[in-house]
């Protein structure tokens, strides 16, 4: 009798497991891949998505996956949406306001009564990671691959991915210069297949400051910098910040550590 019960229970659990696995697979299948959406694999030769196409895809991800939320932090210099994509587990998304409050308390010692409360907040909070892409628009790899990263986090049921999503709130800014991301892609696609295909954009890829938008982290003169500081850094005080760049086809290839504290008073240490 006991054997029959255990056997039946085992079959029931197996059926439940198969159902859950199928549901997870179905969920992943319902999130469109970058390739199915754009018509080519992101990162493939001679293919660039512009900002309009990329932001539309992020809205599709948010509609298809409960792990993804898209916020427009403001408008760029030329009126494009400046977006931040927040990715975490559905459970964390459902208590995002609570987790945000915990993060803000951890960032301000005046809001924590002592060591005991500090440890409690650390235990129930989540690690906040900010990834930014594409401040220099001719470094096309960052804004393009953001779509692949966000798709994987939105759809994958790999154990490692679920572990990350359970413990991390990812704030992803797919382009720090959406105007340039749009212009560079549009220029390339306009001349694709002609003798001018490899020609550089003939104007600055940021309307006012060109390449030097990366030098605006102390003066905050540009709208894109202001949106990033107010909507990400000051709004969340992330523990980890990863700014993605791309090397050119020539020139120096060696990076040296700073061997000194990178003191920047406008960025959390």
Language model region names:
Residues 30-86:
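Mature N-terminal segment immediately following signal peptide/propeptide cleavage
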Residues 41-48, 132-139, 214-218:
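Second-shell loop/turn segments in exported
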Residues 128-130:
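Conserved beta-strand elements of the Class I
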Residues 59, 63-66, 150-158, 218, ...:
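Sec-exported extracytoplasmic/periplasmic mature domains
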């Amino acid at each position: 009798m006991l054997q029959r019960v255990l056997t039946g229970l085992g079959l029931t659990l197996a059926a439940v497991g198969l159902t859950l696995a199928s549901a997870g697979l179905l969920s992943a299948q319902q999130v469109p891949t970058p390739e199915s959406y754009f018509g080519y694999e992101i990162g493939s030769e001679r293919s660039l998505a512009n900002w309009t196409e990329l932001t539309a895809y992020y809205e599709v991800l948010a509609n298809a996956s409960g792990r993804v939320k898209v916020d427009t932090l403001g408008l760029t210099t030329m009126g494009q949406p400046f977006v931040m994509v927040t990715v975490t587990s559905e459970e964390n998304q459902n208590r995002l306001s609570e987790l945000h409050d915990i993060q803000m308390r951890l960032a301000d010692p005046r809001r924590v009564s002592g060591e005991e409360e500090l440890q409690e907040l650390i235990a129930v909070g989540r690690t906040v990671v900010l990834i930014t892409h594409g401040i220099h628009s001719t470094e096309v790899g960052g804004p393009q691959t953001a779509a692949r990263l966000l798709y994987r986090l939105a759809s994958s049921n790999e154990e490692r991915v679920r572990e990350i999503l359970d413990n991390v709130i990812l704030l992803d800014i797919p382009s720090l210069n959406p105007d340039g991301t749009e212009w560079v892609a549009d220029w390339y696609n306009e001349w694709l297949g002609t003798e001018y295909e490899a020609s550089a954009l003939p104007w600055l890829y940021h309307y006012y400051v060109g390449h030097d938008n990366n030098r605006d982290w102390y003066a905050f003169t540009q709208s894109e910098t202001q949106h990033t500081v107010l909507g990400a850094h000051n709004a969340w005080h992330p523990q980890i910040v990863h700014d993605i760049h791309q090397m050119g086809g020539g020139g120096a290839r060696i990076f040296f550590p700073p061997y000194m504290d990178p003191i920047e008073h406008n960025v959390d240490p």
